[in-house]
Structure formats: C-alpha cells, structure tokens
Amino acid sequence: VNDAGLIGTVGISGSIKADGDVRVDVKSEKGIGLRANSVGDHSEYTGEVIVKTNNGTAVGAVGYSGSDDASIKIDPVTGKKVQLLGDVKHFTKYGTQGALIDISLKTADSFLTGASIGANGADRITNLSFDNASTWNMAGDSVVNALINNNNAVIDLTQGADTLNVTDYSGTGGKFVMDTDLASETNGDKIAITGATAGITYVQVKDSSLLSGIEVTGNKSLLLITDTSEKATFTGKHLNAGGIWDVTPTIENGADVTKADGSTGSKKEWYLTKIEKVINNDTGVLLSAMDNSYALWRNTNDSLRKRLGDLRFRDNTVDGDGIWARYNGGKFAGSGFDSGYNMYQLGYDKADNAKSTYGFAIDSGNANARYGTGSGKDKLFAGSIYGTWHGDNSSYTDVVARFGQFDTD
C-alpha cells in the first residue's frame, strides 16, 4: 500500500490476519498506517511489518462509546523485523468495551519511532515489547500499560520525550537513554513505573554538561526513575553518542542518596549522582592518527637531514652537481599506535662553491597504521628547498624550508 491521498488517509483498516509481509507508506500528513475500529475489528500481523507515515500514526485503534472491542497485534515470527515510523495511538476519549494495541519488536533492525499515546490502563491498553537490541526512539511523552525492555533493547527518551509512564515493567539487560542536567538537580527526563518484575536495566545519559563543557562537581542528585513496586534495579552504563567523550553515569537507589540539603531519597527512587567522562574510541583513533602522521613527517625530516649530512663530506672540487634519490622504509610505534611506512625521495644538488651547496627535493610516501581501536592509511607528498654552508673548524649551517600535505583515512 502506498497512499499519497488526503490528510487523514488510512493505509489498512478492518479485521486483518496477515501471515506474510506488510508494507504501508502513507505520504499524506497525519495519516494512519494500520487501524482497528471498535466495531469488532481484530487484526493480527505475524510477518514483516514496515509502516511509514508523514507525521502520523503508525498503529491506531479507534473506539466508539457502546461499541464492540477492537485489537491490533503485531507479533512477528522469528527473524522478521518490525519498523514503525509514527505514533502508536488510541483515538478516543470514550469508554469502550476494550481497545488493545500489542506490538513486539524482536530483531536488531526493528524500531518504533514515535510516541505511545492514549492508553489509560482500563479500556485502552497498549503493550510494547522490545527485545534483542530493537529500539524505541520515543518522539514524545508516552504512556504504556505493559512494557518489556530486554536483551540490549534501547528505549531512547532523548528523541523528543520528557516523560514515560508505565503500569507494568519487565525485562533485563535493556537500556534507557535519557536527557539530563545533573548540575540543575531538577531538569531531565523522567520515568514513572507502577509495577515491575525483578531485573536489571541500564541507564545511559546525555547530560547538558557535555555541551557546556562545565564539569559537574559537588554533592549532586537528579531524580530519573520512580518504581513504586521497588522491584526493578537500574545501573549506569557508558554511552558513546559521538563527539569527544564516553559518558558513564553513576545511578544510585534513593535509599543510598543523601541530598545537598541533608535529606535522603526513598527506596522507590533512582538518582543520577555522578558523571564520568573519558575520551571515547573515536577520539582516541583521531589522536593516534595525529601522532602517527607527525611521526611519519619526522621520519621524512630525518631522512632529509641525513642527505645534508652527506653533503658535508662532499668534495665540491671533485663531485659535481647532480640528482640524488633515496628510499626509506620501516616501522615505528608510539603510545596507542604502530605503523609501517615506505618513503621515496628525489632531489637535486647545486654546488655553488667549495663551501656552499643548495638544492631541492620532493618526497612521496605512505604508511599503514594500526591503533588499539582502529586502523588508518597515510599518504604524504612534500617539497623542500635547502642549503648548507661549511665553515672553518668543521662548523656548518643547514637551512631547510619544507612544505607538504597529508591525506589520512
């Protein structure tokens, strides 16, 4: 289905049982991809489901007062992906006999990008399950009745949401990604859970201090999660969101937190209390690449100085002007890198008199570098002009002007 019709266009509606793959692309604004009405519509999708909307609703249930119930279930068989671009939404303010939206995402390439809207825990139920590194990019404040966050799944509140309310929470090994401002001790995303089963969930943060560059110090605590059941466990996990730093937050239970005013939190609360920043792998590779390029440049300089040393033993009364060539290859290493290189030099010397020689040279070289977390290739092209003057008592003066360009991948 590919529908570019009027605003409010619906892709698929009614009672549908689809074992095969389903793809819906609603190009009109505020359209609905998959819909069930509370007039007895019951839909089940067990194959691949891909729904794209234009600022619309990927999956929606519409209820009418006094009507029959309705449901949409997306439960793909093993290996099938679910990709939903748009909200998951109950379209009604009426009490109905029951409207259910139940969606399971089971693969690493499965995602929901949108909010969960309209669930109330009574006659409008939304159940969402994320497993096996699937992702929820939460584009707005959301309410979910049953939420499963399991096995490296990611629920990311930094995509436009501020709050997530969950009636029943379960899972272990999943992640929450949250916007925070530890320095303020008030601003940040919030998660409220009514009931939970035992399990460990990781928390990653994008703190405002990463943008401001201001280090957060002192006794700070920012409430992130409230679990009324006191059953779930939350712990900090490092996050590499690009930029310079890996960020590892310290997440502590409220019972172990003493606030700046001397009060303590409660066992149902989970606080961000500290942020540790370390240079991430991407930055480490860049720094090592700079060191490697500098080392290669130094090696070519050393080779040119060696040529100038040869000139000091030249007998200008015998040796004439001429072209010279040199190859230099080998390996070098430093902190965090090692490299093998090949360098070719071609030059011309002009003997002005018995004590003065001038010349120019061009260099071309390459290197293959290995870093702790990556690899790279360097290409160098450089040019030099030089002069050497011999004085009495074996004294000498060398002057070199050198320019060049590195290309590093």
Indicate residue ranges for each PLM-predicted region.
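Structural detector of coil-to-beta-strand junctions
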Residues: 3-11, 15, 31-36, 58-61, ...
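One face of beta-strands
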Residues: 14, 20-22, 47, 70, ...
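Extracellular Ser/Thr- and Pro-rich, acidic-biased low-complexity repeat/linker "stalks"
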Residues: 21, 35, 48, 71, ...
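Alpha-helix capping and helix-loop boundary segments enriched in small/acidic/polar residues
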Residues: 62, 118, 371-375
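Outer membrane beta-barrel translocator domains of Type V secretion systems
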Residues: 278-409
